[in-house]
Regions:
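Short, solvent-exposed loop/turn segments at secondary-structure junctions
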Residues: 19-20, 54-56, 117-119, 173-177, ...
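Extracellular glycoside hydrolase catalytic/binding regions
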Residues: 161, 177-383
Length: 418
């Protein structure tokens, strides 16, 4: 597919994810969409990537006229990136989507449509109706349901004369790590998921044959790239290299539910004084359903909520030297492998997220000298292989502290633009 000539030669992408509708309360970063876009343009961005909540707005049959996004309940999750939702905002879902696109038009920006709905978006709902509606869809049909919802969403934008702001459409975010894989057998979810995704892409193309559509993948699934549907119009990957962060996660069994959680070591090495035990840190009873609606596990929420950010950062810095070369090599290898797949398939390449991994809200490892060096290295490599678009960093967005590092974002976006 030939991309529309009105789209930018390079997409400089800021990751607004679901935050553009969860963080709209007084004083929150998306209370004023014009200001958010103005700040993005000042930093060198021309594109934002969002969860457009397509299933909720166009597939669920739920009333979306008065959405009141919520956090995970009380203080639970309030020191986690993306989950520190203040609450207090109320939006008309479809009207807010239209306002986002109108603001994008005013600031000459573009939007990548996506969905996080089978990962965590419904955990921010006022109640569990959104989550239950998603889970009621047969797993074999979920990509097709998303395709229909996104097609309806685009029809809505066409009616309002705003569809030229769409850069491209993703059926879903990080598909192999989402509930799109429910019921699949085998270890290789990338390969096993391909038939479902192919049906979803085909369904979207039936509705909008001249609009680019794709899916995206966590990391770069080297060894499983045969599972990426050949019908995608854009190759999209998220090269999170982790490295030393993987060592931290493994040391304390933060994501490995098959091992006992390292309560005392994590308390001794990472947590703030007075932290409760993991078993005692839960959402209020009325909010516990939210843990079903997000793919982030209780251990990770607990450690992010209760870690001392300085101790977390120090733990990583103390061990980084042992991982530096491997992390740099992985980044380069993944970017080259992604570029090779895209070139072989004749489609443009985009890195929609990156580059190290998921760190606590107030941690600065990815924003500090190590992380900034990875941002520079990643955008240089992205430019070298001819990527159509990339982020500076997943954390370079209005909902994160890194937004204040204007100089780094301008520098990296200038490299991406060439």
């Amino acid at each position: 597919m030939t991309l529309s000539p009105h789209l930018p030669d390079k997409l400089t992408i800021s990751l607004w994810d679901f935050s553009w509708y969860t963080r709209t309360g007084p004083g929150e970063p998306f209370a004023d969409l014009d200001r958010a876009f103005e700040e993005a343009v000042t930093r060198g961005y021309n594109t934002v990537r969002i969860c457009a909540m397509p299933f909720l707005l166009f597939g669920s049959r739920l009333d979306t006229g008065k959405l009141r996004p919520s956090g995970l309940g009380g203080a639970y999750g309030q020191r986690m990136r993306w989950y520190d939702v203040g609450g207090g905002g109320e939006i008309d879902g479809r009207a807010w989507l239209r306002e986002l696109f109108e603001a994008a038009l005013r600031h000459d920006c573009f939007v990548i449509l996506s969905s996080w709905e089978y990962q965590q978006s419904p955990s921010f709902g006022e109640d569990r109706a959104w989550f239950d509606a998603l889970m009621a869809v047969d797993p074999e049909r979920r990509p097709e349901a998303l395709a229909d919802a996104l097609a309806d969403l685009i029809d809505f934008l066409v009616i309002h004369g705003l569809d030229d702001r769409i850069a491209f459409t993703e059926l879903h975010n990080e598909v192999q790590g989402s509930r799109l894989t429910d019921g699949l057998e085998g270890q290789d979810k990338v390969v096993a998921l391909r038939p479902r995704l192919e049906r979803g892409i085909a369904r979207f193309k039936e509705r909008h044959p001249n609009r680019p559509v794709t899916v995206n993948y966590a990391k770069v699934p080297v060894g499983s790239l045969r599972g990426v549907p050949r019908e995608v119009d854009v190759a999209v990957f998220h090269p999170y290299v982790y490295g030393v962060l993987d060592e931290l996660l493994a040391t304390f069994a933060i994501r490995d539910r098959g091992r006992p959680f390292a309560q005392e070591p994590v308390r001794r090495e990472l947590l703030r004084p007075g932290a409760p035990d993991l078993a005692d840190w839960t959402p209020p009873p009325g909010d516990r359903w939210r843990l079903e609606a997000t793919t982030v596990g209780p251990r990770e929420i607990y450690v992010h909520d209760w870690c001392d950010p300085d101790r977390w950062d120090a733990w990583l810095y103390d061990r980084y030297a042992m991982h530096r070369l491997a992390m740099e090599q992985r980044l380069t290898t993944w970017i080259e492998a992604a570029a090779d797949w895209a070139a072989g398939s004749g489609v443009p390449l985009v890195f929609g997220e990156g580059w190290i991994g998921y760190t606590p809200l107030h941690g600065t490892f990815e924003e500090g000298p190590v992380g900034a060096a990875f941002c520079r290295r990643a955008v240089e490599e992205s430019a070298r292989v001819g990527a159509w678009g990339a982020v500076v960093c997943s954390n370079a967005a209005p909902q994160h502290p890194m937004w204040q590092d204007i100089a780094l974002q301008r520098e990296c976006n200038a490299v991406l633009r060439g």
